[in-house]
Amino acid sequence: MPRGPGSLLLLVLASHCCLGSARGLFFGQPDFSYKRSNCKPIPANLQLCHGIEYQNMRLPNLLGHETMKEVLEQAGAWIPLVMKQCHPDTKKFLCSLFAPVCLDDLDETIQPCHSLCVQVKDRCAPVMSAFGFPWPDMLECDRFPQDNDLCIPLASSDHLLPATEEAPKVCEACKNKNEDDNDIMETLCKNDFALKIKVKEITYINRDTKIILETKSKTIYKLNGVSERDLKKSVLWLKDSLQCTCEEMNDINAPYLVMGQKLGGELVITSVKRWQKGQREFKRISRSIRKLQC
């Protein structure tokens, strides 16, 4: 027998024994009446909602995704925001939209409460802004019902600031190692490529970050066993990055000095440093790299 929906949802249902009609939330689309046949098991590879307290979700979801493929493609981009731990209920809020709970005895959709959205937005919108992304219109809190309606509530204040929660570890490639010029040159000689790049797009596949480069803003400093054909793909990888944070690479509009190795046909980043425009250190490093013979 599958387990029940969890204490949170039981509390929601208990407080609303007599339900009126609830409107679907398809942003800019007509209301939609869900049917029980639209309940789907939450797949194991929907990592955004891994460990959520219910097992079945509705399709289409509250963001208008009609297939599981769409959900998986779009949900991965939000995993880093959860990893930033800007609010304890970020995952709950996002999963209530990407994978809304589906209960056997309830045909209506359960949306996130207005207060849940407001709290998450207040804490997480500044984090998104630092990455160059505004809070999207589809997540505007005025779209969600007030707390006296049937909705997913904010956690109790007892759980807002977990005292024992460990700080997320920093990705090895993103650690500030306080290297001098000699250290940087030594690191470069150990790697297969060194590039100055700007980021066009970041996506997330399984546990890894896929970084798509702006092709016209790329400067090549070193290639060893890496062909021009490899670089034409304009794709770099930051491995296992969803298990750690990378503050060094938190601005999609900034240029970066990246070094790495070719592993299994992929260009994998082992070191990343934000390139401060006009900074003397990077101008000096740039000259040193061009003269370097490993």
Curated annotation (Swiss-Prot):
- Give its localization: Secreted
One GO BP annotation of this record: positive regulation of cell adhesion mediated by integrin
Q: Where is the signal peptide?
A: 1-24
Q: List S-S links within the chain.
A: C39-C102, C49-C95, C86-C124, C113-C151, C117-C141, C171-C244, C174-C246, C189-C294
Residues annotated as domain FZ: 34-154
Q: Write out the entry's keywords from A to Z.
A: Developmental protein, Differentiation, Disulfide bond, Secreted, Signal, Wnt signaling pathway
- Which Pfam families did the record assign? Fz, NTR
Q: Where is the NTR domain?
A: 171-294
Q: What GO molecular function annotations does the UniProt record carry, in alphabetical order?
A: endopeptidase activator activity; fibronectin binding; integrin binding; receptor ligand activity; Wnt-protein binding
Entry GO terms, CC: collagen-containing extracellular matrix; extracellular space
Induction of synthesis: Up-regulated in mammary gland tumors.
Name the InterPro entries for this protein.
Answer: Frizzled/SFRP, Frizzled_dom, Frizzled_dom_sf, Netrin_domain, Netrin_module_non-TIMP, SFRP2_CRD, TIMP-like_OB-fold
Functionally, this protein is described as follows:
Soluble frizzled-related proteins (sFRPS) function as modulators of Wnt signaling through direct interaction with Wnts. They have a role in regulating cell growth and differentiation in specific cell types. SFRP2 may be important for eye retinal development and for myogenesis.
Database matches in PANTHER family? FRIZZLED, SECRETED FRIZZLED-RELATED PROTEIN 2
Q: What domain comment accompanies this record? A: The FZ domain is involved in binding with Wnt ligands.
Family statement? Belongs to the secreted frizzled-related protein (sFRP) family.
Q: What is this protein called?
A: Secreted frizzled-related protein 2
Organism of origin: Canis lupus familiaris (Dog)
The lineage, from the top, is: Eukaryota, Metazoa, Chordata, Craniata, Vertebrata
